């Protein structure tokens, strides 16, 4: 049969256990996002169970499905990183052997001076910080002085937080574009992130108008090849930001995981050849980093409910792949991402059920498989598993 469309859904930060080199990335060898959320009574994911989530190599918790509807694998990250950018690039075919720069002690003095000159404003904070805590600790000073809150994390990011009443959102976006130009060469961070917030001290709240300005991928991804070949490449959520707009033919903004799945379900009613690439960031942003086990579990439960709406609406020729880009164990130390294996489940008419693909050694196996499904030649270090799962 002819396969015409792939829905690739990334559950941002849904790791399933520590990778062998987790210690090199500052993580304990016990980190396990799935295991942590399974301690919550808010978790109820029968549809993912039926697809084979608990049958995946290394997943020791949860009841195995005797007859899984999907084929499945555990994916190990080949790239040197544990962040959104590196993870998504690898899913799309690019393995990063060199880690992107990080700033555990804050940004160098010369960089701060360049940013201040470009913005015409002073900078405060300049250290790794939790996004919610930083606006609590520096928001009042920002509102009194107009100085911008610039901070980072364990990831390769420069984040700029500003109150919408002090810096209009469009102006904040312009500052981020300027920062993207300045953060080049050895300082080419993966993402510049606009972090607008509202409210009064001490009850500041971040708004959904976050915007990411990513470094462009260093080579062609499967998205580029699909688009050049005339296929539609639809991004839902922050995919467009992660790839700096490269290889995207249509972008759909979302406000939440739930909104993202509603948009994905709506795409099932459209008719096109290509890829619909979905990122659901709430797992990471709202629950993983905030170490909110119950919140993470409840979000997975809601995703699973919507997955139950999605699956029966799939058409002949549609393929669904569910995966993740890294971990963010809500019971882990600190507030940052965790270096973890991720799940992969592939489902659709014409795809074998219950094939256990074991542990595979690159997220790029997904890109290699997408290239085979869509019959687009693409050179990547990933290895396709299409022959093993197609009927």
Language model regions located:
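Feature captures the catalytic ectodomains and active-site-proximal regions of enzymes
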Residues: 1-391
């Amino acid at each position: 049969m002819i396969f015409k469309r792939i829905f690739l859904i990334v559950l941002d930060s849904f790791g399933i256990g520590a990778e062998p080199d987790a210690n090199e990335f500052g993580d304990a060898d016990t980190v396990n996002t799935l295991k942590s959320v399974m301690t919550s009574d808010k978790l109820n994911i029968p549809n993912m169970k039926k697809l084979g989530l608990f049958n995946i190599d290394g997943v020791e918790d949860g009841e195995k499905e005797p007859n899984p509807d999907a084929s499945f694998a555990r994916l190990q990250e080949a790239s040197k990183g544990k962040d959104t950018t590196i993870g998504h690039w690898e899913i799309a075919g690019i393995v990063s052997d060199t880690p992107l720069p990080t700033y555990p002690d804050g940004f160098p003095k010369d960089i701060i001076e360049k940013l201040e000159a470009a913005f015409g404003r002073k900078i405060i904070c300049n250290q790794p910080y939790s996004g919610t805590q930083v606006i609590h600790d520096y928001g009042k000073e920002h509102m009194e002085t107009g100085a911008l809150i610039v901070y980072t994390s364990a990831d390769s990011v420069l984040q700029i937080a500003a109150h919408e009443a002090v810096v209009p959102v469009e102006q904040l976006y312009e500052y981020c574009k300027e920062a993207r130009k300045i953060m080049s060469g050895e300082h080419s961070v993966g993402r510049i992130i606009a972090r607008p917030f509202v409210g009064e001290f001490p009850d500041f709240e971040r708004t959904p108008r976050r915007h990411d300005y990513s470094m462009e991928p260093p080579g062609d991804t499967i998205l580029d090849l699909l688009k050049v070949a005339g296929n539609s490449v639809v991004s839902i959520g922050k995919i467009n930001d992660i790839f700096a707009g490269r290889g995207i033919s249509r972008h759909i903004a979302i406000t939440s995981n739930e909104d993202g799945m509603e948009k994905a379900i709506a795409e099932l009613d459209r008719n096109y050849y290509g890829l619909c690439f979905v990122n659901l960031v709430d797992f990471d942003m709202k629950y993983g980093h905030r170490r909110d086990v119950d919140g993470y579990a409840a979000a997975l439960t809601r995703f699973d409910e919507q997955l139950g709406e999605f699956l029966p609406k799939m058409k002949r020729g549609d393929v669904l792949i569910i995966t993740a880009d890294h971990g963010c164990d809500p019971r882990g130390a600190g507030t940052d991402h965790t270096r973890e294996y991720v799940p992969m489940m592939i489902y659709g008419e014409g795809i074998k059920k219950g094939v256990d693909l074991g542990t595979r050694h690159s997220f790029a196996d997904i890109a290699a498989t997408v290239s085979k499904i869509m019959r687009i030649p693409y050179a990547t270090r990933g290895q396709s598993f299409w022959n093993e799962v197609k009927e």
